[in-house]
Regions:
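Active-site-adjacent beta->alpha loops and helix N-cap segments on the catalytic face
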Residues: 25-35, 87-101, 118-122, 140-156, ...
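Catalytic cores of alpha/beta
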Residues: 57-60, 120-128, 170-185
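Histidine/lysine/aspartate-rich catalytic loop segments that bind and position anionic ligands
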Residues: 112-143
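Structural preference for beta-strand elements that scaffold enzyme active sites
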Residues: 1, 16-20, 39-41, 78-82, ...
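Non-catalytic, usually N-terminal nucleic-acid engagement modules in DNA/RNA processing proteins
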Residues: 1-99, 233-245
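Glycine-rich adenosine-cofactor-binding loop
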Residues: 114, 136, 145-182, 186
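Glycine-rich phosphate-binding active-site loops on the catalytic face of alpha/beta enzymes
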Residues: 24, 47, 137-139, 170-172, ...
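C-terminal accessory extensions appended to soluble enzyme cores
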Residues: 191-245
Length: 245
């Protein structure tokens, strides 16, 4: 589950197995709950940070942000955390320098995030150097559905190398068949934002949309209900995992 920071009550009561949260948004109550989850993944929140800075017209202090990220990881002994994959903003060479500092000052390997712009050779290199990598670009449409077959083959390659792959922003029905070790997205909030609702029917999530021109009742109630249902779905998917590593 990703983006659960505003839903303390539901998360505490229903206890998801796996949680991803952005460093930019993470709350103290989530830190308290971490030990109860099977796995916690920390996203750098770099894009959110950058957009906030852009709105204020201030220069982006990447060194300062990275320093705070490192401090949080060390203070709370975070085991799984992503690099600052801001290639399209600062270039991949700068990303690699930040990754090197991140790993040197935490004493742990980060989860690098492969983007299509990095190329096939870099994907293979990451598979040689890291036990756990991410693939980004689904949520922002840099990877189109017509390219999913290619991505599936990349994941198969990584699995054959014994590498775990996280699909960032991908929770479609066929996520299990990709061979991803883990996936995340904030899909659980999407239909709620547009007035709809989603529920787990025992094997998949079903979306219920309001009649045209109407918006569903109380947003908070729908959001809490949707999160509960997605936690059920998460636990179901956990029994269906097909990671081959």
């Amino acid at each position: 589950m990703a983006g659960t920071f505003p839903a303390e009550k539901v998360v505490r009561e229903n206890r998801p197995e796996y949680v991803l949260e952005s460093f930019f948004y993470i709350k103290p109550w989530q830190v308290e709950e971490m030990s109860k989850w099977k796995m916690f993944l920390l996203d750098s929140g770099a894009f959110t940070f950058m957009h906030g800075i852009e709105a204020s017209s201030k220069p982006v202090d990447w060194d300062g942000y990275l320093g705070r990220y490192i401090d949080f990881i060390n203070r709370h002994d975070i085991q799984h955390f992503f690099e600052l994959d801001v290639d399209i903003i600062v270039g991949y060479d700068a990303v690699k320098r930040m990754r090197a500092r991140l790993e040197a000052e935490t004493g742990k390997k980060s989860i690098p995030v492969w983007h299509r712009s990095r190329g096939l050779d870099e994907f293979k290199r990451l598979c040689r150097d890291y036990p756990y990598i991410g693939i980004g670009g689904f949520a922002i449409k840099h990877i189109q559905p017509s390219e999913y077959g290619y991505i599936r083959r990349l994941v198969q390659y990584a699995n054959a190398c014994g590498v775990r792959v996280h699909g960032l922003g991908y929770t479609k029905k066929d996520a299990v068949d990709f061979g991803f070790y883990s996936v995340d997205s904030t899909t659980w909030t999407t239909q709620v934002n547009f007035g709809g609702l989603s529920y787990f029917n025992g094997s998949e999530m079903v979306v219920v949309r309001p009649p045209k021109g109407m918006i569903g009742a109380d947003y908070r109630i729908r959001r809490e209900y949707a999160l509960k249902e997605w936690i059920k779905y998460q636990k179901y998917l956990d029994t269906k995992g097909k990671w081959r590593g």
